[in-house]
Amino acid sequence: MPSSIDTIFITHDHKDHISALNVFLKKYNPKVYMTSKLKRALDNKINIKNFVPLESDFTLEDLKVNVIKTSHDASDSVGFVFESGKSSLVYITDTGYINVKYFELLKNRSIYIFESNHDVEMLMNGKYRYDLKVRILSDRGHLSNDMSSDYLVSLIGKNTKYVVLAHLSEENNTVEKAYQTLVNKLEINHIEDKKILVASQSEVMNMIEI
């Protein structure tokens, strides 16, 4: 139930990530965690009454939250590593690359929710304007299927149970391409099968328990 949601984490201010926030906050009053820079960018758009600054790692009850700076053409953008006991989850989407300084923190986590935005060939042969294609491929754009899979091959470990490929472009990707790219790279690198799921933009996934 929406009323049971007491905490929201905002990664960045692009419309596809915050379009429902204003409506939700008119009816409910959860704590909203975001960076101060991002809050300032949204002040004229959304009335956030219960704002909590998100500037560094912290603990929320029994949940440790690590903040990862991502590289995206937004007012500010972040990803997260959530830890509770022996379980952990990485959430990274909307980034052109991942800074190497975070690699050790990101390794061998239980679940990865990871951007696999586009197939480069589909993007370059598609109908997007050239400047938009350049933006998507830039260091402040999005991870392609190949980039995402390369990162995941170097990060996942024996404790990893699930990989969820997320933020797929409906114009420049397919579920099959994203999935098969990762499967192929896991096989090449002799990494045992993990449970690989692909998130849909229009359908809610089942709950994952670890």
Regions found by a protein language model. Name each.
Residues 35-41, 54-57, 201:
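Short, polar loop motifs at secondary-structure junctions
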Residues 49-51, 65, 196:
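Generic structural signal for residues in well-ordered beta-strands
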Residues 100-199:
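Cap/insert and terminal regions of metallo-dependent hydrolase folds
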Residues 1, 19, 53-111, 208-210:
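Core dinuclear metal-dependent hydrolase active-site scaffold
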Residues 194-210:
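Short, basic/aromatic-enriched C-terminal tail that caps enzymatic domains
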Residues 14-18, 40-42, 74-75, 98-100, ...:
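Active-site environment of divalent metal-dependent phosphoester hydrolases
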Residues 19-28, 43-45, 173-180:
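Metal-dependent catalytic neighborhoods of phosphoester/phosphodiester hydrolases
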Residues 1-34, 38, 110:
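Active-site metal-binding motif and surrounding structural segment of the metallo-beta-lactamase
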